[in-house]
Amino acid sequence: LDGVEALVHLAATPDDVDDPVNNLFPPNITGLYHTLELAREAGVQRLVLPSSGQVNWFRNFEGPWPLDETVPVSPKGWYAATKMFLESIGHSYAATHGMSVIIARLGWCPRDEGQVREIADETIYQDVYLSPADAGRFFIGCVEAAPEVRYEILYATSKPVETLRYRLDRAREIAAFEPQEQWPDGTEIIF
């Protein structure tokens, strides 16, 4: 990582699994540790770390909407708990090591046809959909954000179909992110 100024860390197990001790914690906790330490040792200035809207799972259904980064977390399960850890340790690295850390609370980025069908069945999932192109725009904005950004939690989704579930004001302000797409834009590349 020598000479790297910004690192977008996307390596993780992205869902709950039957055996979290063996299949979730190693990539999402131990892998994160190794990534953060390598970045720190190499002098990486900006880390963009992927969290998830799943840290607010129950609030996603209960409201009031839109949720923002100040709403207390209500995780769905162990996957979301690993993302809560990521958010906390990211804050520690920003405070202790002077790194710029942006936490990306991502909407649903489907990875296969089954997930696309799940999203198609529920408007709430369509409202938190994040298209591949909007994800790219968001991450570019995070990497290019002002160097004085110390620690931020930003939500990222495409345009909602019905209800704005996540407030994107901070993402607009910090990462100049403005979603351009809406469900089902971009799903054709998943097949």
For each predicted feature, which ranges?
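NAD(P)H-binding glycine-rich loop region in Rossmannoid oxidoreductase-like domains
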Residues: 1-27
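Glycine-rich NAD(P)-binding loop of the Rossmann-fold in SDR/ketoreductase-type enzymes
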Residues: 6, 23-34, 42, 73, ...
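Catalytic helix-loop patch of NAD(P)-dependent Rossmann-fold dehydrogenases
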Residues: 26, 62-97
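Conserved Rossmann-fold NAD(P)-dependent oxidoreductase catalytic core, especially the SDR/UDP-sugar
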Residues: 34-74
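Conserved beta-loop-beta element that borders a ligand/cofactor-binding pocket
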Residues: 51, 87-112
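Alpha-helical substrate-binding/gating segment
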Residues: 106-115, 129-151
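Conserved C-terminal active-site "lid" loop/helix of NAD(P)H-dependent oxidoreductases
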Residues: 117-119, 151-154, 159-178
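Amphipathic terminal alpha-helices
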Residues: 183-191
